[in-house]
Amino acid sequence: MNENLFASFITPTILGLPLVTLIIMFPSMLFPAPTLLITNRLVSIQQWLIQLVSKQMMNIHNHKGQTWTLMLMSLILFIGSTNLLGLLPHSFTPTTQLSMNLGMAIPLWAGTVIMGFRNKTKISLAHFLPQGTPTPLIPMLVIIETISLFIQPMALAVRLTANITAGHLLMHLIGGATLALMNISMTTALITFIILVLLTALEFAVAMIQAYVFTLLVSLYLHDNT
C-alpha cells in the first residue's frame, strides 16, 4: 500500500521522463486487429461488444451522425480498458487526471457543436432562446443557455474524474484499514476484507459504466447537432 493517499494519482516517471504516453497507448495493444481468416475468442468478444454497443447507441442517429460510429466505439473501448487496467495493483489510471479527461471531452464536444452550427445554424441558434420567452428575460436566458452549453465538456470530464477517483480512494482506505485491523481483530479485518472484495467488484462495473456514460453523452450531444 502507498503511504501517501494520493500517490496513486501521480503520473509515474522513469529517469525523469513521464510514462503517461506509454500508459495511454498500452490499452490499444489489448485489442488485436482481426487479420486472420479464423479469429480467436478475444477478437470475437471484441467484435460482439462493438456491434452490441453500436446498435444501442447509434440507432438514434441519421447518416451524418453514424459517421462517428468508429470514433465513439474506439472511445468507449479506450476509456473502459484504461479504467480496468487502473484497478490492477501498483498501476496508474490516466482517467483520474482532469486534464486528460478535458483533453478528450473538449475536442469531441467542440466537434459536435461546430457540426451543428454548420449543418443546422438556425436550429442551433434557436436553442439559446426558447420559444415564447418574455422580452425582459431574453438577455438572461441567452446568457444562461450559453453557460450551460460551455459547461457540457466540463461536466463530462468532472463526472468521469470524480467517479474513478472516488472509487480508488475508497479501495485505498479500506485496504489500509484491513491491514491495520489484522493486528487488532482478525474477525473485523476479515469483514473489512470482504467489503474490499465487494467494492473491487463494484469498481469493475463502475469502470465500464463510466466509459459507456461518457460515450453516450457525447453521442447525445452529436444527436442534438445533426
UniProtKB/Swiss-Prot annotation:
Subunit a, of the mitochondrial membrane ATP synthase complex (F(1)F(0) ATP synthase or Complex V) that produces ATP from ADP in the presence of a proton gradient across the membrane which is generated by electron transport complexes of the respiratory chain. ATP synthase complex consist of a soluble F(1) head domain - the catalytic core - and a membrane F(1) domain - the membrane proton channel. These two domains are linked by a central stalk rotating inside the F(1) region and a stationary peripheral stalk. Belongs to the ATPase A chain family. GO terms for biological process: proton motive force-driven ATP synthesis; proton transmembrane transport. It catalyses: H(+)(in) = H(+)(out). PROSITE patterns: ATPASE_A. One of its GO terms (cellular component) is proton-transporting ATP synthase complex. It holds the Pfam family ATP-synt_A. This is ATP synthase F(0) complex subunit a. PANTHER family: ATP SYNTHASE SUBUNIT A. Coiled coil: none annotated. Gene3D superfamilies: ATP synthase, F0 complex, subunit A. Component of the ATP synthase complex composed at least of ATP5F1A/subunit alpha, ATP5F1B/subunit beta, ATP5MC1/subunit c (homooctomer), MT-ATP6/subunit a, MT-ATP8/subunit 8, ATP5ME/subunit e, ATP5MF/subunit f, ATP5MG/subunit g, ATP5MK/subunit k, ATP5MJ/subunit j, ATP5F1C/subunit gamma, ATP5F1D/subunit delta, ATP5F1E/subunit epsilon, ATP5PF/subunit F6, ATP5PB/subunit b, ATP5PD/subunit d, ATP5PO/subunit OSCP.
